Curated annotation (Swiss-Prot):
Native source organism of the sequence: Bacillus cereus (strain Q1)
Domain annotation OBG-type G: ranges: 159-329
Gene that encodes the chain: obg
Protein name per Swiss-Prot or TrEMBL: GTPase Obg
One term under GO cellular component: cytoplasm
Residues annotated as binding Mg(2+): 172, 192
Top-level taxon: Bacteria
Protein residues bound to GTP: 165-172, 190-194, 212-215, 282-285, 310-312
Amino acid sequence: MFVDQVKIYVKGGDGGNGMVAYRREKYVPKGGPAGGDGGKGADVVFVVEEGLRTLMDFRYQRHFKADRGQHGMSKGQHGRKSEDLIVKVPPGTVVKDEKTGQILADLVTHGQTAVIAKGGRGGRGNSRFATATNPAPEIAENGEPGQERDVILELKVLADVGLVGFPSVGKSTLLSVVSSARPKIAEYHFTTIVPNLGVVETGDNRSFVMADLPGLIEGAHAGVGLGHQFLRHIERTRVIVHVIDMSGLEGRDPYEDYVTINNELKEYNLRLTERPQVVVANKMDMPDAEENLQAFKEKVGDEVKIFPISAVTKQGVRDLLFEVANLLETTPEFPIHEVADESDTSVMYKLETEGVKFDITRESDGTFVISGYDIEKTFKMTDFSRDESVRRFARQMRGMGIDEALRARGAKDGDIVKILEYEFEFID
């Protein structure tokens, strides 16, 4: 089964927790702090595997959660970083964040990698919090939560040339006679329901990959007739070969077919019109084909170069292949996506107080609910079993401006404040 789009969940490993520990040393309060830092959580890394051809495996496994880092230990020993979770994908896979629509990676070459969900850093042990006024702190951090997201995987076939046109115009037959590909061919519409690839050799030491794409119909750009699934595979091609049935046996007008297909390409992705297009008048061995071709030429004008062929008899096919090979030599690749830059520019352990974003809402029972990435991360990294950690969290909330914002919303002593699933009292 050919699967070219799936939604999956990925989560980087949480960082390991820092440790509160002390060493035994004479004249040093409590022996001095000796708690180690937690190890970094594992990343979720996508790797291109050239042997894969479809996203079928993701139909059965849709959750990928990397391991957390090892916790810090006594004697100042830091936890070990966990090994990254490797997820293999086929060449041509585009990874998109479902929530934002951002393109996270465009994976095309064997061995190419991309970090899709970063692991969290390890929490600091108590030795990191020692100061002149507090030489033996009873405080350590929990590990930072790993990044988590839902992502859409789209497979867009890697081909130099894409065959487009209405169903049953002869695309599959053409591919079968110019390459060793053996697509399914029959006298009914939508025989081809998945892309078929074939390597074409021109006879003068040139070759290229051609894709027979499923037939398009009017409204394909809006998803009619599985149009989105079909059209996405054209995006990587450098040359479009537009196959038109000149026989008239289907009762359609060749010129109307030509206009309709080009409109669908334009509506789906305007950049598809930048690619050179070779117009192929197929089925020229049929009785009315010559007359239909003349009428077609009158409507499109002299600017459109047309290659009359018969895929069945191979008439005109050689000239067509040479034209396509010539175009490929002068046509650059078209980048189909601008990949988002998610490089980590944060400074470890530095609390940024400017621009901290959070939301405060109020439930029907009067509970204040605080949400936002920074406060939720800080909350998760706090060890609430230790009083010093609780006091530090209170200072961090004040530093973020949350206390002041709660007062502005009318919060008073004893009001309930909620972060994630935890509730506590507001003390002014």
